[in-house]
C-alpha cells in the first residue's frame, strides 16, 4: 500500500512501477503528448549504452535525433531549438557524441513530465488504477495460510449471518418504547433502507483526492447552489452510508499531495557555462522584479504628493481664477523696461518744471521769446484740452477675492497719483516747445491739430523729435500707470498659488455649515484673525435674510458637549469651537 501511495508523491515512483507507468502512458495518449515519455526512456537507454561502451549508441543517437529532435522529422517541438541544433550539427559532421550530449533535452523532458504528472494525479484514471491495484493486493494472501484464511472467512461469514439473524429477530419485536426511541430515526431516514439495497457498501478502499473543507472551499456555495443548509441536510441523510463505509472499509485513506522541489535550495553549477548563464538569468530576473517594485512605490508616492499639493477648495479656485488672461505674463525684461520708463519720466518731469515759462500772472516775457511761444502758448481753450487729456480710461472691473479687498487703500492711492500726474503733464506742450526753441533743437510743428472733444487721440499728441522726445505727456503717464495697475490686477491668487496651501495647513482654518438637507459643506480659508458673520456668508455665498445661522460654542453649564448660538449681526465675531467654525442653517 505504501508503494502505491508513492505514485501521487513523485514522478519517479510512477516511472519505476510498471502498473503506474502503463496508466500514465494511457493518460498521456488520451490527453497529452506521449512522445516525451518515449524520448525520456530513449535518452536513458543511450546513456546506459554509452556507460557500458556499446557501439550501438551511435545508431541509437541518430534514431533519437531523427525521430524526436529533428526540425523536419522530429515530433518534440516544445524542446528549445538551441538544445537541438548542436546535436544535429555534430551528427552531420560525423563527430562522436559525448555521453551526456542529451542532458539538456533530458532536463527539459523531466520538467514537462512533472507538470503532466501533477495533472495525472488529479484524474479519474489515476484513482481507478489506484483502487484496482489496492483491491488486488488486498485479496492476495500467502499460499501456506490459504486454507486457514478460508476457514477464518467461513467462520466470520457464519458468525456474521447469525448476528444479522439475531438483529432481525430483535427488530421485529415492536413495543411502544422501541417506537418512541426510533421515532426520530424513522422520520429522518425515510427511504434509506431501499437506498442501502441499491448501493451496498463496497469492500474496497475508498480513495479520494485531498481537498479543503466545505467552509474553506474556493468555490462559493451560494453560487453553485450548494448552500450550507442544503449541505447539512444532505449530510444528515447520507450520514449512515458514510458510517457503513467506514465500518466496512478500514483502509480508507487520502492520497498525499505531489511533492515539489524547493527552489530555495537549488544549487547552481558555476563550473559550467550553462550553470553560470542560468544563475545570471535568475539574478537578473530578481533584480528586475525589485526595480519594478521600487518604481511602483515611487509612482504611488508621487501621486500621493500631488494629491496633497492640490488640496484647495472650489471657492479658492473660483476666486483665484484670473478673468482676463489675455494680458500675458510679465517677465524680467518687461519689469526692467517699466522701471526705466518710470525713472525717465520722473527725471523729465523735474527738468520740464525747471524750464517751463512763467504764466500770465508771472513776470512779462521778452518780445522775441513771446513771438516764439505764441503758437503753442495756453489759450482760453486750455480747460477743454485739459479735460480731454486727463480723462480716465474706463476699464471693466472684475470680482476679486477677499485678499484684494485688503489692498483697496493702495489702489486708491494709485488712482490719486494718476490724476495728479495727468494734471501736471497737461501744460507740458508749451513748456517743452519753449525749451526746444531756447536750446536750438528741432522746432516743434506749428500746425495745430484739433481733435473732437472726448477723443482718445488728443492725448497722443506729443513731440517726438530730438532727445527731448522723452518729455512727459498725458499718454505716457497714463499708459505707464495703467500698466502698473494691470500688474496689481494680476497679483490676484491663482490656483497654482493655492496649491501650495496644502503644504502648510497651519495657515488655514476650517469653516463649515450644516444645511437644511443635513448635508455638510466644508471649506478651508486663510486664518487672518477673527471672522465676522458677513465674511462667513461671503465664503459660502449665502444670501442675507433667507435662513438663520446657529454657531457651535462651548456649553456654559457643561451639561452638553456644545451649545448653539444664534448670530444675526453681520459684524459680530464668530466663535471658534474645537479649532474650527461650525454652524447649522435653520
Curated annotation (Swiss-Prot):
PROSITE patterns: DIX, RGS. Keywords: Cell membrane, Cytoplasm, Developmental protein, Membrane, Nucleus, Wnt signaling pathway. Gene3D superfamilies: 2.40.240.130, Regulator of G-protein Signalling 4, domain 2. Residues 137-168, 344-442, 478-501 are annotated as: Disordered. Residues 151-168, 368-388 have a biased composition (Polar residues). The keyword Nucleotidyltransferase does not apply. Residues 421-442 have a biased composition (Low complexity). Residues 486-501 have a biased composition (Basic residues). Residues 1-135 are annotated as: Required for interaction with apr-1. This is Axin-like protein pry-1. It comes from Caenorhabditis elegans.
Amino acid at each position: 500500500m505504501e508503494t502505491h501511495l508513492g505514485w501521487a508523491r513523485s514522478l519517479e515512483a510512477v516511472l519505476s512501477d510498471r502498473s503506474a507507468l502503463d496508466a500514465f502512458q494511457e493518460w498521456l495518449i488520451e490527453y497529452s503528448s506521449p512522445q516525451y515519455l518515449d524520448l525520456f526512456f530513449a535518452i536513458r537507454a543511450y546513456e546506459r549504452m554509452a556507460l557500458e561502451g556499446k557501439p550501438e549508441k551511435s545508431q541509437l543517437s541518430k534514431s533519437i535525433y531523427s525521430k524526436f529532435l529533428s526540425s523536419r522529422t522530429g515530433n518534440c517541438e516544445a524542446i528549445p531549438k538551441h538544445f537541438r541544433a548542436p546535436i544535429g550539427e555534430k551528427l552531420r559532421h560525423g563527430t562522436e557524441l559525448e555521453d551526456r550530449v542529451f542532458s539538456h533535452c533530458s532536463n527539459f523532458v523531466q520538467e514537462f513530465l512533472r507538470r503532466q504528472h501533477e495533472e495525472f494525479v488529479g484524474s479519474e484514471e489515476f484513482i481507478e488504477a489506484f483502487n484496482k491495484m489496492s483491491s488486488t493486493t488486498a485479496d492476495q494472501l500467502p499460499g501456506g495460510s490459504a486454507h486457514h484464511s478460508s476457514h477464518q472467512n467461513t467462520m466470520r461469514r457464519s458468525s456474521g449471518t447469525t448476528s444479522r439473524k439475531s438483529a432481525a429477530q430483535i427488530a421485529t419485536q415492536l413495543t411502544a418504547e422501541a417506537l418512541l426511541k426510533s421515532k426520530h430515526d424513522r422520520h429522518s431516514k425515510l427511504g434509506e433502507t431501499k437506498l442501502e439495497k441499491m448501493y451496498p457498501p463496497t469492500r474496497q478502499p475508498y480513495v479520494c483526492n485531498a481537498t479543503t473543507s466545505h467552509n474553506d472551499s474556493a468555490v462559493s456555495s451560494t453560487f453553485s447552489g450548494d448552500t450550507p443548509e442544503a449541505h447539512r441536510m444532505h449530510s444528515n441523510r447520507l450520514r449512515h452510508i458514510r458510517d457503513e463505509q467506514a465500518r466496512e472499509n478500514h483502509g480508507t485513506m487520502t492520497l498525499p499531495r505531489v511533492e515539489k522541489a524547493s527552489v530555495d535550495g537549488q544549487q547552481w553549477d558555476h563550473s559550467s557555462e550553462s550553470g553560470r548563464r542560468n544563475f545570471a538569468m535568475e539574478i537578473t530576473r530578481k533584480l528586475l522584479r525589485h526595480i519594478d517594485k521600487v518604481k511602483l512605490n515611487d509612482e504611488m508616492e508621487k501621486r500621493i504628493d500631488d494629491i496633497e499639493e492640490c488640496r484647495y477648495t472650489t471657492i479658492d479656485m473660483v476666486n483665484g481664477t484670473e478673468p482676463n488672461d489675455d494680458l500675458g505674463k510679465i517677465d524680467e525684461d518687461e519689469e526692467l523696461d517699466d522701471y526705466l520708463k518710470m525713472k525717465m519720466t520722473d527725471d523729465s518731469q523735474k527738468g520740464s518744471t525747471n524750464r517751463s515759462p512763467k504764466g500770465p500772472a508771472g513776470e512779462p516775457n521778452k518780445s522775441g521769446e513771446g513771438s516764439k511761444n505764441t503758437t503753442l502758448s495756453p489759450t482760453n481753450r486750455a480747460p477743454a484740452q485739459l479735460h480731454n487729456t486727463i480723462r480716465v480710461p474706463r476699464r471693466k472691473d472684475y470680482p476679486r477675492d477677499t485678499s484684494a479687498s485688503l489692498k483697496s487703500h493702495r489702489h486708491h492711492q494709485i488712482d490719486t497719483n494718476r490724476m495728479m500726474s495727468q494734471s501736471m503733464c497737461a501744460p507740458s506742450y508749451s513748456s517743452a516747445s519753449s525749451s526746444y526753441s531756447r536750446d536750438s533743437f528741432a522746432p516743434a510743428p506749428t500746425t495745430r491739430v484739433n481733435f473732437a472733444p472726448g477723443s482718445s487721440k488728443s492725448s497722443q499728441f506729443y513731440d517726438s523729435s530730438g532727445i527731448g522726445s522723452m518729455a512727459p505727456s498725458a499718454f505716457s503717464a497714463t499708459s505707464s500707470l495703467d500698466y502698473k495697475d494691470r500688474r496689481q490686477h494680476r497679483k490676484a491668487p491663482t490656483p497654482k498659488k493655492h496649491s501650495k496651501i496644502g503644504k502648510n495647513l497651519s495657515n488655514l482654518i476650517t469653516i463649515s455649515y450644516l444645511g437644511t438637507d443635513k448635508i455638510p459643506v466644508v471649506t478651508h480659508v486663510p486664518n487672518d484673525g477673527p471672522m465676522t458673520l458677513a465674511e462667513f456668508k461671503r465664503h459660502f455665498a449665502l444670501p442675507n435674510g433667507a435662513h438663520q445661522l446657529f454657531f457651535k460654542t462651548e456649553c456654559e453649564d457643561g451639561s452638553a458637549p456644545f451649545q448653539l448660538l444664534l448670530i444675526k449681526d453681520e459684524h459680530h465675531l464668530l466663535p471658534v469651537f474645537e479649532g474650527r467654525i461650525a454652524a447649522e442653517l435653520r
